[in-house]
Amino acid sequence: MAEAGQARFERIQVAPAYQLVAEAIEREVIAGRLLPGEPVGTEAELVRQFGVNRSTVREGIRLLEQSGLIRRDSSRRLFAAVPHYDRFAGGISRAFVLNEITFRELWESTLAIETAVAELAAERITDAILAELEDNMRKSEKAMKKPSELALLDIEFHDILARASGNRVLQFAREPENKLFFPTTEMLFRRNAHAAERNKAAHTAIIEALRAHDKAQAVLWMRRHINDWKRGFELIGKSIDQAIDRTYAED
């Protein structure tokens, strides 16, 4: 029991208003309602929408610029952006970078995990998740010439597939590499003229295999898909034996 005069509860820590502004905008970007390259609004518009003062908005924007979720153009207008890998990466992902994990190691582990995901998904996928994958394909069709947006949709495709596996350990296991894979896919779509079409072909074949509950074809196409990234890197002059940090830094 609390003694007389002794506080039973700790004070509630209320987040500063600028942090709430930053979190509100961040949620829109992460949810895909605000896509990379789309205008966020002027400072004056954000002041009016959030009902806070200009300094609060500016501080919130500063946080988002530091995290890479907002950028300014030459006229100082604000746009949603895609963070670089080190801003995506947390926990284990950051340890990968600090320990100079190579892209070869990332590719090998991704190959093992994603083929296991594909095999289980072929057995367990539902009509609802198939519909999500098909919707992802429709959005990807519209983003074929937009490397950053297409790379985000590629991540979404594999996230949906992981849920289809019904195995939460695999879902968690793939998260660190998933965070680090975004810059690689964006780089390929930007620098390899055939990468987007090859990605589309692989995703289409994987969906067809899942619809037929064909484990062998799902695994085969996933293996081809992941191996294709390795070949793509070599074609644009990247070494998969370089550390992840160096691979991105030299892009």
Predicted region positions:
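Short linear motifs at protein or domain termini
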Residues: M1-I113, E119, S239-A243, T247-D251
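Conserved amphipathic alpha-helical segments that form helical-bundle/coiled-coil interaction surfaces
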Residues: T110-M187, N199-E208, Q217-G232
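Luminal/periplasmic acceptor-recognition loop/helix of membrane-associated glycosyltransferases
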Residues: R191
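Short helix-capping and inter-helix turn/linker motifs at the boundaries of alpha-helical repeat units
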Residues: H194-E197
